[in-house]
Structure formats: structure tokens, C-alpha cells
A protein has these predicted regions:
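C-terminal motif of bacterial Sec signal peptides marking the signal peptidase cleavage site
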Residues: 15-18
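Extended ligand-binding regions for polar small-molecule ligands
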Residues: 20, 64-73, 149, 156, ...
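Extracytoplasmic small-molecule ligand-binding "clamshell" domains
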Residues: 29-108
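Bilobed "Venus flytrap"/periplasmic-binding protein-like clamshell domains
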Residues: 59-74, 127-180, 195-199
Length: 262
């Protein structure tokens, strides 16, 4: 799950290897480069295992791996090469960049929020919001969160869920790393984050989490409102992904929840 609108951190472009398809997408930033149509994706690499940066500054995770597959699928489906470029930025700036035609897509752990005026793809992952706790915390249930100090990511669906907790003092922070740093310093009683992110941090033994979820969700790709052409192409890619062996492999690799497919 993730966020909604403010400042660009950096504009590092990563071209994921591989060719993919079709004529130029409906967005103003999709273009032909070396006979390949380029789709630019805004991504916030602070949300492992969805997306993060390694020591070389490369963006890694489920979503970048998915984008690499989308390049292949688009080439096969459209019959002309495509490239997907990842443009690094703050999560809460992605929607603004879409609206300004600076990027074509946002792929960064987005879960549905009615107030986000964007085009939504079909879902590609299951998700939920859970409470992460410092190791040794006396909190064992969602009821125990009442009246507690809770950190969330600004603009996220986790923020919305936390504000529903009776008497909770909810503070929005910039990104998941800031949240968990503050939590480990005992500045907050709990944090509400995506389950995939929570499991990533709980695995190192520093944190625990409440077994119950605050809300169950799904992850989506987003585009500028009205840009149905690029979303239609991505929906075909998602359909191909969900039916492939690679899908379960990626979910297992990153410890994420696959969608139930018929």
C-alpha cells in the first residue's frame, strides 16, 4: 500500500533490459527511442520488498522485476519493442508527476484509494495493513492499539486505517525507513505498514507484528486519469503475468501474497 503527493527526490532513470511492444502510448511521455517505445514509470524505492535500492544504487524488488516481464509481454503482444524506464521519486510525488505528464505510470505498492483521481489497472498482488511493534512490546492485538502513538506513511492507506483506531495519536512520516527508524528508537508504540514491508523488517528480529490485519487490500498500477490506452496495455500484461509460472516465483522470492486466480 502506499501514498500520495509532494517532492522529487532524484530523477535517476534505470532502463530495464529487454524489448517490449507497440506504438506510442497515449501519454505525452511515451516515445520511440532506438525503435522502442519507452514507458516511464515513477517509483519510490523505499518500500522493500516491493522496491528498494541496493548498494550499487540499482532499484530492485518485486515491482522492478515485474516491469522487466512487462517489457517482454508488450513486445510479444504488440509486435514492436518497448522499454520501461524507472524514474526514482518520493512516493507522494508520483500522482503529481502523472498529472503533469512527466511519467506514464506509477508502480510503487499502490492500493486503492477513492480520493486518488487516477486510472487504476487490474490488481496484481494481495496486500494488507498491519501493525509493527518494537520487540518486547506488550501490544498483542488491535484493541491494544487504542490510545497509542502510531507512525504511518503520509498519504498511505495505512494512515487512513490508523486514524480509525480509537484515541490513537497518528503521525505521518515520509517513508517506511523513517517510520521504522523512529519505531526502533521507541518514539512510537507501533507503526502501520503494508504486510510485505512488515514481514521484511520482522524477519531481522528487531520488530514483531500483530497477527490481525487492519484492512485487506490489493496492489495496482496507476496512470493519469483518462490515459486508458496505457492501462489497457498494462492490464493485458497483468493477465499474462497472473497466468504465468513467473508470478508465483516472484511472490515466493519476495514473500508477497499472490492474488487468487481462477
Amino acid at each position: 500500500m502506499k501514498k500520495l503527493m509532494t517532492t522529487v527526490l532524484a530523477t535517476t532513470l534505470l532502463t530495464l533490459a529487454g524489448c517490449s511492444s507497440s506504438t506510442s502510448a497515449n501519454s505525452s511521455t511515451a516515445k520511440d527511442t532506438d525503435n522502442a517505445t519507452v514507458i516511464t514509470v515513477g517509483i519510490s524505492p523505499d518500500y522493500a520488498p516491493y522496491e528498494s535500492e541496493n548498494t550499487n544504487g540499482d532499484i530492485i524488488g518485486f515491482d522492478p522485476d515485474m516491469c522487466a516481464l512487462f517489457e517482454q509481454y508488450l513486445t510479444e503482444q504488440e509486435g514492436t519493442p518497448y522499454k520501461i524506464e524507472l524514474k526514482k521519486m518520493d512516493f507522494d510525488n508520483i500522482v503529481t508527476q502523472l498529472q503533469g505528464d512527466q511519467i506514464d505510470l506509477g508502480i510503487s505498492g499502490f492500493t486503492y484509494a477513492e480520493d486518488r483521481k487516477v486510472e487504476w489497472s487490474e490488481p496484481y498482488l494481495g496486500s494488507s495493513q498491519v501493525a509493527v511493534l518494537p520487540k518486547g512490546s506488550s501490544i498483542t492485538s488491535l484493541d491494544d492499539l487504542k490510545g497509542k502513538k502510531i507512525a504511518v506513511q503520509t498519504g498511505s492507506t495505512g494512515e487512513e486505517a490508523a486514524k480509525e483506531i480509537e484515541g490513537a495519536n497518528v503521525t505521518g512520516l515520509k517513508n517506511a525507513q523513517d517510520i521504522l527508524n523512529a519505531l526502533s528508537a521507541n518514539q512510537y508504540d507501533a507503526a502501520v505498514v503494508d504486510l510485505g514491508v512488515a514481514k521484511n523488517y520482522v524477519s531481522n528480529g528487531t520488530f514483531t507484528m500483530v497477527d490481525e490485519s487492519l484492512v485487506d487490500e490489493q496492489n495496482y498500477v496507476i496512470a493519469k486519469l483518462g490515459n486508458t490506452e496505457v492501462i489497457d496495455k498494462i492490464n493485458k500484461c497483468i493477465e499474462t503475468l497472473l497466468a504465468s509460472d513467473e508470478y508465483k516465483t516472484l511472490c515466493d522470492k519476495y514473500g508477497l501474497t499472490p492474488l487468487e486466480t481462477k
